[in-house]
A protein has these predicted regions:
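Non-catalytic signal-transmission and effector/linker regions of two-component phosphorelay proteins
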Residues: 1-4
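Acidic, metal-coordinating helix/loop segments flanking the phosphotransfer/catalytic sites
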Residues: 17, 32-53
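Short, charged helix-to-loop "capping" segments that act as catalytic/coupling loops
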Residues: 23-31, 57-68, 72, 137-143
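CheY-like receiver
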Residues: 44, 51-129
Length: 163
């Protein structure tokens, strides 16, 4: 699995990536990382589908984007990617829920909490993000299976009123 770690403190990047690597080794799942010192650096290089999850420090460098604003901009690019906030303070917890994070990890991150979070990520990613539906192109034509992103579904209506 490929993770992005957005953290301005090198020692926190190394600590978190080490814990993730340990947990993945126990589970027999390979893990690799791309680390970014700022929200701006991360967003400049972000490509949808490149990461399975983003670990994002809320209290990034005061001169740039904080983690909440980085997450807001990220959500414009990818609605489904799991965001896990890391923080030493809970002051922004309520504001952070606006971007629908998968989890919050309080620093210093505890290995057992991280193990639970990584399992949560795997379960989240196991849910399909796309359906395949048959679409007919005309009378008598064989239906063709087309992918439909779950993010594109606004509502579903069932004209059948009886069960």
């Amino acid at each position: 699995m490929h993770y992005a770690i957005v953290e301005d403190r090198t020692e926190d990047q190394e600590y978190l990536s080490g814990l993730i690597r340990e947990e993945h080794k126990k589970a027999g799942i390979p893990a690799d990382f791309s680390c970014y010192p700022s929200g701006e650096a991360f967003l400049q290089e972000f490509t949808p589908g490149a990461f399975q999850a983003i670990f994002l420090d809320i209290m990034l460098d005061k001169n740039g984007l904080n983690g909440i604003e980085t997450a807001r901009r990220l959500r414009r690019l990818s609605k489904r990617i799991p965001i896990i906030f890391t923080t030493s303070e809970l002051d922004f917890a309520l504001e952070g829920y606006e971007v629908h994070p998968l989890d919050y990890l309080l620093k210093p991150v505890k290995p057992e909490k991280l193990a639970w979070c990584l399992q949560e990520i795997r379960e989240y990613l196991a849910v399909p993000s796309c359906l395949t539906i048959p679409v007919s192109s005309g009378q008598g034509a064989a239906p063709i299976n087309r992918p439909l992103s779950l993010d594109d579904i606004l509502y579903v209506e069932n004209p059948v009123t009886a069960c």
